Amino acid sequence: MINPELQQYVEREILPRYDHHDAAHRRDHVLTVIGQSLAIARQLRQQGVDIDEDMAYAIAAYHDTGLCEGRDHHHEVSARIIRQDMELRRWFSPEQIEVMAQAAHDHRASSGHAPRTLYGRIVAEADRVIVPETIVRRTIQYGLDHYPTLDREQHYERTVQHLREKYGEGGYLRLWFDDSPNAARLTRLRQLIASPAQLRPLFDRLFAELK
């Protein structure tokens, strides 16, 4: 069970920050990452791994707070926010806070190195919300927010390029747990990416809903 005071603080002071992010990284996203992080942490505890669920919860809650300063270095900013938030010292030791900051820094899928700690692997895995329709939707949302001058065909080309670079065979996304449900989901997503006959109608429907 998460510390009630920590949860109240996060819900009051941290989660509202996501309401100002782009549509692909708002409150629904962070709540999903929190839920998946806790599910992974609890599964590991059942396997006998020593995991602090409060740490896993807080890391997930803070992992994208750095988007307030843009996307390119948001993982670094998120780590800084954790280190500078004096309220976290009510619940965590300096050593725990440093582990949490490192985990937030390491969560980004496009980072060139593996997460340094188990907590980094947890939030990185939880951040891979591999539900094919959700992935395509979030990709379109990001494109509409950040490239508003593109027309429909250009958005489709950008979507396909991003999906291939991140999720395709040889893409930069990595999964950190062999028994992760994301493994089967990634296989289904790759099948979708490889099939324009399936991907294009899905794109057209979602684009019309979001435009």
Regions found by a protein language model. Name each.
Residues 1-16:
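Short alpha-helical hairpin
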Residues 8-12, 27-35, 54, 59:
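Short amphipathic alpha-helical segments
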Residues 19-49, 62, 111-211:
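Divalent metal-dependent phosphate-bond-processing catalytic cores, especially two-metal-ion Mg2+/Mn2+ enzymes
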Residues 51-70, 74, 78, 99-109:
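His-Asp-centered metal-binding catalytic motifs of divalent-metal-dependent phosphohydrolases/nucleases
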